[in-house]
């Protein structure tokens, strides 16, 4: 899963020069971090009477899937139950402030022996049943997993002197409870190592719940990660953080109640915890495939897999245990080569080649394969079969998309016509519970050919509102459009209704009748969706069409670890992205920055509505020079000190025209998290 951080920095303004100090309207330079999809947002329930039942068309579509897939195959359930030791504690997990972090009973309505409701795709329901097989499990001798204590699994390996933990979940609170559960059933040995398999927050955020940083600094605990981990963990989504976070509140269904007409999980796991996110930098970096490390008496061979499921990722094999850890590159779902929250597109061809490499490196020797989501696979033959199937799945997406593109088909046409070979299509672990064939194919097209399909009619289309008004006019007005759309709705053509009625909504967002019809269509599409994120997008869209956007408080909970890990280069890039070019047009500001504790200097130049920075440069004619320690910058971003106080204490020294710093900050844009998605 994908981690992300959105930072919002409050601008400072209204300087007064008489005192020679900068006075600020906002009392601090603040940063807000939102990790994966509004994890910190408490779910808001829809009123029970707003969710409508499944229509006959939806029931029929879901029943048809029952005939397409081998639902009588119970292998997945046997694997998910294997090695069970103890259930999860059923008490709610709360943070220091009494905030709800994790509710293990939240998805209790999903029963293993219960048929899918009419309002849930039966294949997604099956996946959610499997994910909800929770607790502490033995993978093999000396390897244990805690599953469904968060979005991801936490793995514990017993070594010579202590234990090694793989991927300590999202939050310190959930990670601590997971470790406590393990200790209730196994000897209480010290944690001697942590392995981060990749750079997404559900694989490192709870680290301070299982180890003390003092032990890391003293050398008692080592932390292993792939090269580029820190850069990717902090930077992957900073620049588009607000947009990604808002869209991810749709993707993970954070605004939906868990229910048969609401959220049933994300396909990769149930949902995200809402606790304290931390990050301790790794002590040991894995740089290449074939690199080996002896960790607490066990031999690990690593495969470096950058640009697969994450920018920085690694798989590995534990020789003495004959165990492959595939990180998140091979689980029990088709993963995302593009995340609907928004992200850079991942390369399915490279992904396929990494899995092929894993087969040839370890397939002849492994007795068990496990990942950081879902349940393991046991037995050489079954492991190789699974890896080959997923290898071929990603390779087929790449190759078939390009084959059809070279026939002249467009992105949407390819996604519509795309068919997997039957052996790949009917293997449950290849189904699109998290990713989907449709949106992964579209992503692959864009990866190679970009957004333009080649038809000049689509080269410079009107923006949504302008186009919508003209569509409605050409269709004879909103009433005529809705009347005709209702006929299509009654025939079960919900995709077409959603496409057409969207024009009515964007032409006149005050028309509740149009929004209600659009919501009804999206809701039925959600009930039919096999992908958890698709279902969540559809149902959240329906909710906001009916109710409007509920602007919940966005908590100011910047993670100190993440802020401290943010490079100065990234910090200045982020400031530049926030520059409001209209406000800054025609203005010129030049500032020298000297970070005394890091012995780094930066030159900031604002001109032409752009903010550039240069490491190691200095301008003697600059408007002002600013001197401070990096620790002071961190304290400002975390709101531990105000800009005015830092100036008064001498933690920040400014020579030259002090008001120019305030002027620059006044040009920085602030972003509203709750921007509209399903309305203009």
Pin down the residues of each PLM region.
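Feature captures hydrophobic
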Residues: 12, 47, 493-499, 506, ...
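Conserved beta-strand hairpin/beta-sheet module of binuclear metal-dependent hydrolase folds
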Residues: 129-189, 313-318, 322-328
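Divalent-metal (often Zn2+) His-rich catalytic cores of metallo-beta-lactamase-fold enzymes
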Residues: 52-62, 66, 323, 333, ...
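Active-site metal-binding motif and surrounding structural segment of the metallo-beta-lactamase
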Residues: 161-162, 172-222
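Metallo-beta-lactamase
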Residues: 138, 162-172, 224, 230-305, 312, ...
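Alpha-helical segment of the N-proximal tetratricopeptide repeat
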Residues: 469-500
